[in-house]
Amino acid sequence: MKKMFFTVAIAVSIVSVTTAFANPDGLQQKKNENQFAESFKQLSRDTAWEQKEKVDLKFNTYHPQGMTKIGDLYYMSSVEILEKPVKYEEPRDGYDRTTGKGIGHLFVFNQQGELLKDIRLGEGDMYHPGGIAFDGESIWVSVAEYRPNSESIIYKVDPKTMQPQEMFRTNDHIGGILRDGEKGNLKAVSWGSRTFYEFDSKGKVLSKDSNPSHFIDYQDCESAGKDNMICSGITELPQQGSSTGKYELGGLALLDMKTMEIEHELPISLVSSQGHTVTRNPVYLENTGEAIKLFAVPDDDKSSMLVYETTKLNTK
């Protein structure tokens, strides 16, 4: 499996800023916190998504993981793989593969796809960033070994100074992390989102539960108003017949952040020009009031950000 987290990447935020490099003090007040979740519940497999924009990113994106948007700027985590992990024939010391080598990135880019900042994250074998999320003050990023049941560093990044701060370390591959509100505990998912975690701000594990859903592996998540989060991701299924390729089933899910129970989910059949499901890599959702916008970077290396919008929703 690849990164297997929740990086929306889907990242979902209903907060915006007015300054160029994200002054948290300039955040506009949150409006209609529950509207996002209610609008999302109107989506189905029959929802029409219209592509509004394609922004070619003017830098090597490597293997994108998670994304969030603050004002007019986009923040995207990515892993640059220098040496791919190799599967063992038999597990060794509890691991199923080598560590590999790589570099963790948090890219900042503008609406024209121009790279403004490349923040390096990670240490040693922990070089694989996961899904990211903005809590109204800081961006939270997990950086793990590129293998399950391993180790992770949890950072928060000040979008004003662009400086990362290590918050704690934990003994599992954390594929994505977000904060429950600006001051709440941290919600996280493991490799393939098979396990849900709740941490306090110092890294103490408050709860650890199995994910009951096997529809998709959450790739990226972010808050969607009060008490809710939206996650995006994929699962790879075998093709029928003689094909040796994998079919990428994409999807979105709305979860209750307190109980981690699914409130609504739907498949996403949109694909990129390279044939990847758009929820394969980072996804960010934005509630416009009348519609929902979906920002996605599904392809590696030479990537484009694809922007879709739903038809008008009934927001009464």
Predicted region positions:
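Residue position within the beta-strands of beta-propeller blades
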Residues: 76-77, 141-142, 188, 231, ...
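Short coil/turn segments that connect the beta-strands within blades of beta-propeller domains
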Residues: 71-72, 136-137, 182-184, 226-228, ...
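Beta-propeller blade signature
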Residues: 93-112, 152-160, 245-259, 307-315
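A short helix->beta-strand "capping" segment at the edge of beta-propeller domains
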Residues: 34-60, 117
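Short, conserved, GDST-rich strand-edge loop motifs in beta-rich repeat architectures
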Residues: 77-101, 144-148, 233-249, 302-308
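A short beta-strand motif characteristic of beta-propeller blades
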Residues: 51-57, 114-122, 163-168, 204-210, ...
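Repeated scaffold domains used in trafficking and secretory/extracellular systems
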Residues: 62-66, 124-131, 171-181, 214-223, ...
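Loop/turn-rich, solvent-exposed surfaces of beta-rich toroidal or solenoidal domains
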Residues: 214-261
